[in-house]
């Protein structure tokens, strides 16, 4: 049997909001260590990897490993029925074809329970190699979301240029071009407002803004976001989830066309 109780149920609601527009269905791998999900998006351009460690839940029990095929749109609809303050419990029998979701109001005067049908999914796990990155930028997640949103009014792609002193986001399109440069911050009162850059070598890469705007739906999960970049390997956009784990998105850079062609 699997049972996990999360007093801060809003975390699960935010996770689903961050996944559902990118992935239709995915396999939730449940083990004694926690909950993991790894899936390509429906157009096979980006990859999502979610980890929620068992110790981040308030109670957690998993007698044997489970692979639950979940329609994320359905799960998101059910989680919308939970209040932001609700305590959420997930429960499934070992060979179950349904997942139970129980929402308890904090005053315990209201309990809602839902059962969601599970799916049979054929899933291939992709190995994600450990990688050293040329540039790692940590910045406020709201700032990154705004930059991606603003530049998508200008063009379809963003060029991210990372140097020691700062990181530049540029886009160009029919109406012209736009550049946003963030300098490394030296002294900030709050750590989550800082921009920090670890650079081994400068990097300049181009990415589709459509996907970055999907990724920034995870902004409510974390006050900061980390961008890890190296030439010719996918960008990693990572949102830490409190004391529970992380949500990582991987996106391959666009290959620049030959001069003007």
UniProtKB/Swiss-Prot annotation:
There is a cross-link at residue 164 (Glycyl lysine isopeptide (Lys-Gly) (interchain with G-Cter in ubiquitin)). The gene is Pcna. Homotrimer. Interacts with p300/EP300; the interaction occurs on chromatin in UV-irradiated damaged cells. Interacts with CREBBP (via transactivation domain and C-terminus); the interaction occurs on chromatin in UV-irradiated damaged cells. Directly interacts with POLD1, POLD3 and POLD4 subunits of the DNA polymerase delta complex, POLD3 being the major interacting partner; the interaction with POLD3 is inhibited by CDKN1A/p21(CIP1). Forms a complex with activator 1 heteropentamer in the presence of ATP. Interacts with EXO1, POLH, POLK, DNMT1, ERCC5, FEN1, CDC6 and POLDIP2. PANTHER family: PROLIFERATING CELL NUCLEAR ANTIGEN (PTHR11352:SF0). The keyword Transmembrane does not apply. The keyword Translocase does not apply. Auxiliary protein of DNA polymerase delta and epsilon, is involved in the control of eukaryotic DNA replication by increasing the polymerase's processibility during elongation of the leading strand. Induces a robust stimulatory effect on the 3'-5' exonuclease and 3'-phosphodiesterase, but not apurinic-apyrimidinic (AP) endonuclease, APEX2 activities. Has to be loaded onto DNA in order to be able to stimulate APEX2. Belongs to the PCNA family. This is Proliferating cell nuclear antigen. Gene3D superfamilies: 3.70.10.10. It comes from the Eukaryota. Keywords: Acetylation, Disulfide bond, DNA damage, DNA repair, DNA replication, DNA-binding, Isopeptide bond, Methylation, Nucleus, Phosphoprotein, Ubl conjugation. GO terms for biological process: base-excision repair, gap-filling; cellular response to hydrogen peroxide; cellular response to UV; cellular response to xenobiotic stimulus; epithelial cell differentiation; estrous cycle; heart development; leading strand elongation.
């Amino acid at each position: 049997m699997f049972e996990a109780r999360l007093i801060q149920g809003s975390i699960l609601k935010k996770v689903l909001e961050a996944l559902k527009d990118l992935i239709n269905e995915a396999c939730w791998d449940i083990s004694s260590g926690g909950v993991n999900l790894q899936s390509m998006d429906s157009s096979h351009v980006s990859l999502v990897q979610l980890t929620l460690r068992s110790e981040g839940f308030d109670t957690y029990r998993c007698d044997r490993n489970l692979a639950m095929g979940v329609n994320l749109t359905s799960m998101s609809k059910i989680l919308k029925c939970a209040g932001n303050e609700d305590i959420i419990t997930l429960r499934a029998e070992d060979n179950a074809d349904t997942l139970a979701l129980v929402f308890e109001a904090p005053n315990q005067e209201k309990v809602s329970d839902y059962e969601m049908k599970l799916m049979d999914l054929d899933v291939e796990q992709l190995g994600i190699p450990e990688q050293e990155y040329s540039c790692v930028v940590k910045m406020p997640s709201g700032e990154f979301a705004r930059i991606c949103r603003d530049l998508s009014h200008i063009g379809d792609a963003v060029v991210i240029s990372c140097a020691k002193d700062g990181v530049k986001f540029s886009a160009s399109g029919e109406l012209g071009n736009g550049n946003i440069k963030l300098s490394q911050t030296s002294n900030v009162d709050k750590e989550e407002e800082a921009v920090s850059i670890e650079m081994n070598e400068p990097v300049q890469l181009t990415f589709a803004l459509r996907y970055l705007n999907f990724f920034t739906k995870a902004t409510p999960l974390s006050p900061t976001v980390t961008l890890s970049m190296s030439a010719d390997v996918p960008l990693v956009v990572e949102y830490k989830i409190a004391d529970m784990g992380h949500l990582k998105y991987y996106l391959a850079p666009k290959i620049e066309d030959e001069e003007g062609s």
